[in-house]
Curated annotation (Swiss-Prot):
BP terms from Gene Ontology: actin cortical patch organization; actin cytoskeleton organization; barbed-end actin filament capping; mating projection actin fusion focus assembly; mitotic actomyosin contractile ring assembly; mitotic actomyosin contractile ring contraction
Keywords assigned by UniProt, alphabetized: Actin capping, Actin-binding, Cytoplasm, Cytoskeleton
Keyword Cytoplasm: yes
Family label: Belongs to the F-actin-capping protein alpha subunit family.
GO cellular component: actin cortical patch; cellular bud tip; cortical cytoskeleton; F-actin capping protein complex; incipient cellular bud site; mitotic actomyosin contractile ring
UniProt lineage: Eukaryota, Fungi, Dikarya, Ascomycota, Pezizomycotina
GO molecular function, one term: actin filament binding
Signal peptide annotation: none
Protein name: F-actin-capping protein subunit alpha
Task of the protein: F-actin-capping proteins bind in a Ca(2+)-independent manner to the fast growing ends of actin filaments (barbed end) thereby blocking the exchange of subunits at these ends. Unlike other capping proteins (such as gelsolin and severin), these proteins do not sever actin filaments.
Stored InterPro entries: CapZ_alpha (IPR002189), CapZ_alpha/beta (IPR037282), CapZ_alpha/beta_2 (IPR042276), CapZ_alpha_1 (IPR042489), F-actin_cap_asu_CS (IPR017865)
Compartments where located: Cytoplasm; Cytoplasm, Cytoskeleton, Actin patch; Cytoplasm, Cytoskeleton
Gene: fac-1
Length: 273
C-alpha cells in the first residue's frame, strides 16, 4: 500500500498545466495535521518542474527560461544558453535566485547557439507565449532542443501546455523526439486531453537553422493532425453520444457547440451569479 508521501507526491507530479499552486493549496488543507509533509516533497516538485519544462523569469530578466534535466547543473542550479547565465532554483516555490554568468564551452557550442537563434525566429512567429532552449548532452555528443508553450485561462476554466523535446545527433544528422499536449477543462466537469506524438526526422544540412526548420515542419504537421482529429471526434464518436433533445428540451446547434460556454449558453442562462 502506498504511503501518504507517495500518494501526495503523485498529486504534485500529475498537476495539470498552470494548476500546481491549486494542488499545493489542496495538499495543505488535506494534510493540516502534518504541516511538514510539503517540505518532504522536494523530489516530486523537481520531477514536475523538469518534466513539464517549467519556465521562470530570472531576477532582472524579461524572458522566461526553462527548467529541465538537460539544463541542470550541480547543486540545484540550472543554466540558459541565450542569456549566458546560471541560477539557483527552488522547486517548491518555483523561484530563481543567485544569477551568475555561465559561458557555454564545448564541441557543440556553435551548433547549440545557432539552433537557439533558429528557434527564436520560429517560436516568436508561431507561439504567443513560449520558451525554448538548446543544450549539449551525452558528453557533448548530441544536442537537446526544448520548446514549451503555456496558455492559461482560469476565468474560462481551462489551461493548456505544449511541450516538445528533440534530440539531435550530429553523427548521422537525425532528430528523434516527441510532442506532448496537455489541456485541462474543468467547468462543471473535469476533462483532460493528453497527447504524445513521436517524431523522427533528418536534417540534411546539419545546421542550427536546419534543425529549427525541421522542427517547424513537423510541429505544423502535428497541429494539422490535431485539428483533423478534433473535427473527426466532433462529427463521429461525440455525435453518437448526444441526446436528440437535451434536458432543456431544446435542440442544440451542434455545429456551433465549440462557441458555447458550458453551463451558461447551453443552459440558457448564467451558471454563476
Amino acid at each position: 500500500m502506498a504511503s501518504h508521501k507517495e500518494i501526495v507526491s503523485s498529486f504534485v507530479e500529475g498537476a495539470p498545466p498552470g494548476e500546481l499552486a491549486d494542488v499545493v493549496a489542496d495538499i495543505k488543507a488535506l494534510t493540516s495535521s502534518t504541516p511538514n509533509l510539503l517540505n518532504e516533497l522536494g523530489p516530486a516538485f523537481q520531477k514536475y518542474n523538469e518534466e513539464q519544462f517549467t519556465t521562470v523569469k530570472l531576477p532582472g530578466g524579461s524572458q522566461p527560461v526553462i527548467i529541465s534535466s538537460h539544463s541542470s547543473l550541480e547543486d540545484g542550479r540550472y543554466y540558459d544558453v541565450e542569456s549566458s547565465s546560471s541560477f539557483a532554483y527552488d522547486h517548491i516555490t518555483q523561484k530563481a535566485s543567485d544569477v551568475q554568468s555561465h559561458v557555454l564551452e564545448g564541441e557543440q557550442t556553435d551548433l547549440v547557439k545557432s539552433t537557439v537563434k533558429g528557434l527564436s525566429a520560429y517560436v516568436k512567429e508561431h507561439f504567443p507565449n513560449a520558451a525554448y532552449g538548446a543544450y549539449p548532452i551525452e558528453n557533448d555528443t548530441k544536442v537537446a532542443v526544448v520548446i514549451v508553450a503555456n496558455k492559461y485561462s482560469p476565468n474560462n476554466f481551462w489551461n493548456g501546455r505544449w511541450r516538445s523535446l528533440y534530440i539531435y545527433d550530429p553523427s548521422n544528422n537525425s532528430i528523434e523526439g516527441s510532442i506532448k499536449v496537455d489541456v485541462h477543462y474543468y467547468e462543471d466537469g473535469n476533462v483532460r486531453l493528453l497527447t504524445n506524438k513521436t517524431v523522427t526526422a533528418t536534417v540534411s544540412s546539419g545546421t542550427g537553422s536546419g534543425i529549427a526548420k525541421e522542427i517547424s515542419v513537423n510541429e505544423k504537421k502535428y497541429q494539422e493532425e490535431l485539428n483533423k482529429s478534433f473535427t473527426s471526434l466532433s462529427e463521429g464518436a461525440f455525435k453518437g453520444l448526444r441526446r436528440q433533445l437535451p434536458v432543456t428540451r431544446q435542440k442544440i446547434e451542434w455545429d456551433k457547440v465549440a462557441s458555447y460556454r458550458l453551463g451558461q449558453d447551453i443552459g440558457g442562462g448564467s451558471s454563476r451569479r
